Amino acid sequence: MADLAKIEEQLSSLTLMQAAELVKILEAKWGVSAVTPIAVASAGVADPVAEAVAEKTEFEVVLTATGDKKVEVIKIIKDITGLGLIEAKKLVDEAPKPIKSNLKKAEAEEIKNKLEATGAKVELK
């Protein structure tokens, strides 16, 4: 069991490039492929480095500054989050603060545009 812990520790310390190279070496030695059949059908041969840089699918909207129209920003935050007026005001007062998480890109962009229309500064992460 101690040997497995050592191996786990060594693997955890590898960089992404080193891990990709290790995958290639093991695939060649064992005659197997780490690519799943679904990925092969949809994307061809998968590159581990490319998978790590895949397009982001979930976004977080972060209010960084309120601008001049703080009351309008509070109203929009209240509508978007479903918070009460006091909670929405507190969230706005504590900027920079995440407003909503795990959003699709289109929904995150829509929220960002609504807030920026009032003069607020917003980031998507």
Curated annotation (Swiss-Prot):
One Pfam family assigned to this protein is Ribosomal_L12_N
Q: Which SUPFAM superfamilies match?
A: ClpS-like, Ribosomal protein L7/12, oligomerisation (N-terminal) domain
Gene Ontology MF terms: mRNA binding; structural constituent of ribosome
**What are its GO cellular component terms?**
cytoplasm; ribonucleoprotein complex; ribosome
Q: In which domain of life is the source organism classified?
A: Bacteria
Give the UniProt keywords, A-Z. Ribonucleoprotein, Ribosomal protein
Q: Which GO terms describe its biological process?
A: translation
How does this protein assemble? Homodimer. Part of the ribosomal stalk of the 50S ribosomal subunit. Forms a multimeric L10(L12)X complex, where L10 forms an elongated spine to which 2 to 4 L12 dimers bind in a sequential fashion. Binds GTP-bound translation factors.
This chain's function reads:
Forms part of the ribosomal stalk which helps the ribosome interact with GTP-bound translation factors. Is thus essential for accurate translation.
Q: Which family does it belong to?
A: Belongs to the bacterial ribosomal protein bL12 family.
Q: What is this protein called?
A: Large ribosomal subunit protein bL12
Task: Give the encoding gene's name.
Answer: rplL
